[in-house]
């Protein structure tokens, strides 16, 4: 058993959830600081982003289905060992209610997309934002399949934004 799994197993669900939510708050705050330091703050940042609910929902749904299909394919093609993230995902979602899962995923999506797409990609470009996104998921760095998957997903999300179709950050 790895040290990471030992640490994870030693945490209560409450501690784990607090840690996960704090990491998302940290990403949002870093994004806010970067928006003010590198740009003109929230107002100009948000007005520079497109807001097209119809196309965003339609194309976002197609993108999500495609990503789920690729995810299923990855799980069929690669060994369980190459996809083991130390049990974090299973531990995080195992005890959550479906409503809590939806809420948590929305928080993660908002905070991470705010930092990496709305802020970092706007100022530093797609390659840097995508690599930083992949490295933030540091537990995947030693797992080439997972790291590559997250990097490709990040690039795909960045290209999605480049096409100017985004709902919110």
Regions found by a protein language model. Name each.
Residues 11, 15, 19-20, 161-168:
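Charged interaction patches that mediate protein-protein contacts
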Residues 3-4, 30, 90-93:
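Short secondary-structure boundary micro-motifs
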Residues 32-36, 138:
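Membrane-embedded alpha-helical segments of multi-pass transporters/permeases
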Residues 26-31, 63-71, 112, 129, ...:
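Alpha-helical transmembrane segments of multipass membrane proteins
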Residues 28, 38, 143-144:
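Residues in flexible loops and secondary-structure boundaries
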Residues 81, 93-169:
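Transmembrane helix-loop-helix hairpins at the membrane interface
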Residues 14, 19-25, 37-108:
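Juxtamembrane helix-loop-helix connectors linking adjacent transmembrane helices
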Residues 1-14:
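Short, Lys/Arg-rich, polar N-terminal cytosolic tail immediately upstream
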């Amino acid at each position: 058993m790895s040290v990471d799994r030992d640490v994870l197993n030693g945490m209560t669900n409450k501690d784990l959830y607090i840690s996960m939510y704090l990491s998302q708050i940290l990403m949002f705050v870093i994004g806010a600081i970067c928006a003010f330091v590198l740009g003109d703050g929230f107002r100009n940042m948000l007005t520079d982003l497109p807001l097209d609910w119809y196309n965003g929902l339609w194309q976002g749904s197609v993108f999500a289905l495609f990503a789920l299909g690729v995810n299923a394919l990855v799980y069929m093609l690669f060994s369980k060992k190459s996809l083991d993230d130390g049990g974090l995902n299973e531990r995080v979602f195992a005890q959550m209610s479906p409503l809590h899962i939806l809420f948590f995923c929305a928080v993660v999506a908002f905070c991470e997309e705010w930092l990496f797409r709305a802020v970092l990609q706007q100022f530093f470009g797609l390659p840097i934002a995508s690599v930083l996104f992949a490295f933030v998921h540091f537990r995947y760095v030693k797992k080439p399949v997972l790291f590559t998957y997250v990097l490709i997903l990040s690039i795909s999300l960045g290209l999605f934004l480049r096409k100017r179709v985004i709902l919110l950050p």
